[in-house]
Amino acid sequence: MNIIGLTHKESGCGYHRVILPLAFMDNIKGYVTNFITEDKTDDWDILVYNRICQYDINWNKTKELLGCKVVMDIDDHWDLPYNHINYQSYQDMGKRIETNISEADLVTVTNQALLNKVKQFTDKAVIMPNALPYGINQFTDIKVESDKVRLFWCGSVSHENDIKILREPLKRLTGNIQMVMGGYNDSDPLTKSIWDRMFSMFAGKHPS
């Protein structure tokens, strides 16, 4: 089976929901790109992408060009609260996502709650839980011994409000604790400022 995946290098969702599954799936030919060149339009059985892609303007034309089934993955809810960093952009994107759900030959989701939401638009949906290939490459468990109890959180700047929820409860923790955060990104001033706020809220009085 030949599967082409669409994502871009800065997408964490694309990495975990498109790239990793294709990298570790048995008995397939997988290819991942952010743009399908003319020489890569033939011989595909499945096109898979997360949420949106540049070819979702006209699905009839895209399916005719590639001649394959389309699998859309959606790993989180697209109806965002007003205080979410991506709220404004998703006001326009929501309808696009719902159209993509309806047009897909199959939709994969991460959990039952999301499946229930997606089934409002299609009955061709299944749960594919998040997973990591533990024991391989960067996912090898190399534990550094410590006398501290380490609390680990990993995510992106889109979770700033989630960290705010944790801020006060974390202040009540006592003992020999070390706070560890993963995903830090200082690629631009805005992203860095959000991460610095998140780190301050998460670590609080505890060493990091």
Tell what function each PLM region has.
Residues 49-66, 163-165:
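An aromatic- and histidine-rich active-site surface loop
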